[in-house]
Amino acid sequence: MEPEIKIVNVVVSTQIGTDIDLEYAADILDNAEYEPEQFPGLVCRLSDPKVALLIFRSGKLNCTGAKSKEDAEIAIKKIIKELKDAGMDIIDNPEVNVQNMVATADLGIEPNLDDISTLEGTEYEPEQFPGLVYRLSDPKVVVLIFGSGKVVITGLKKKDDAYLALDKILSTLKELEEEYY
């Protein structure tokens, strides 16, 4: 049975304009914080969808915490509308690029991390971190595997890559099982 994959974080970026007046934007946006001595961007938190948006003077905007690219796009559209309504020169429909997705899943088994740690591309130091770090080259992702069978997959650009990564891991575990047992 295929493990259920849950996307827990999507980070996207876009360009909403140039030379954004962050002081003015902080005044007009609800839930916005701008403290340039601590961070060079404006931080705006939305509750629906629940995301954080980082807006920089250059016009670059990052959205983090979304559960899907669509949620991130909805959040970006909300911010763009507020900024445009306040008279700011903002790009209407900017191209939104996924920078990273994080997914979780349960393998449904309790893998032997010591056995897996013999594979190329793995790091396992249980005294420092309870999970095994497995770097795959295709898809180019990092998978954290825990003794409970839970996995965290980072570096995704699309959800399909999470399924590819899990398929590779499950077939590798099957091969290891045949080799060791």
UniProtKB/Swiss-Prot annotation:
Alphabetical UniProt keywords: DNA-binding, Repeat, Transcription, Transcription regulation
Keyword Transcription: yes
PROSITE patterns, per the entry: TFIID
Sequence repeats: 7-83, 98-173
Coiled-coil segments: none
InterPro entries: TBP, TBP_archaea, TBP_CS, TBP_dom_sf
GO molecular function: DNA binding; DNA-binding transcription factor activity
Gene3D superfamilies to which the protein is assigned, alphabetical: TATA-Binding Protein
Pfam assignment, any one: TBP
GO biological process: DNA-templated transcription initiation
Domain of life: Archaea
Function of the molecule: General factor that plays a role in the activation of archaeal genes transcribed by RNA polymerase. Binds specifically to the TATA box promoter element which lies close to the position of transcription initiation.
Protein family per UniProt: Belongs to the TBP family.
Protein name: TATA-box-binding protein
Organism annotation: Methanothermococcus thermolithotrophicus (Methanococcus thermolithotrophicus)
